[in-house]
Amino acid sequence: EGVAVNDELTLVIDIGKSHAKLLMVDAQGTVVERHGRANASVPSALGYPALDVQGLEDWMAQTLRASSHTARCRRVITSTHGAALVALGDEGLAWAPVDYEFDGLAQHPLLASAFDAAADGFAYTLSPDLPAGLNAARQLFYVQNLHPEAWRRTRCLLPYAQYWAWR
């Protein structure tokens, strides 16, 4: 027994820096159900601020289990910050996702200089030299150099939006 096409909903997962939302939207664009929660970084086991993946996942699972509309959702659309990414290992997260506003390299001037020397310029990347972790390469360089064991566990990198669609 399926859901009639005109009864189908799209689940929108919108994860912002300070707030996360789950919306269930019908074919006409009407929001049928809306849920939200505060969102903030959490301390990681490696000592840097991390995106709250577990808190968000627990909230989403609880919210979707409690909704009478979940069975009607046939599509998922995710929206997150473009600099957020997740590293997967053989058994889930390889390391907690670095908060993209964390400037880990600023705490290590020699490492920051090494990054600046190694990074390709705008003409090659078409990305300006953004501060903190707003260039994902800064986050990756930070983990590679300060947490090499965590980096070795990395098998795959996913943009944050794709992680939530996959999850």
Model-predicted segments: where are they?
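N-terminal glycine/serine-rich phosphate-binding loop of ATP-dependent small-molecule kinases
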Residues: 2-96, 153
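Glycine-rich phosphate-binding/catalytic subdomain of phosphoryl-transfer
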Residues: 65-167
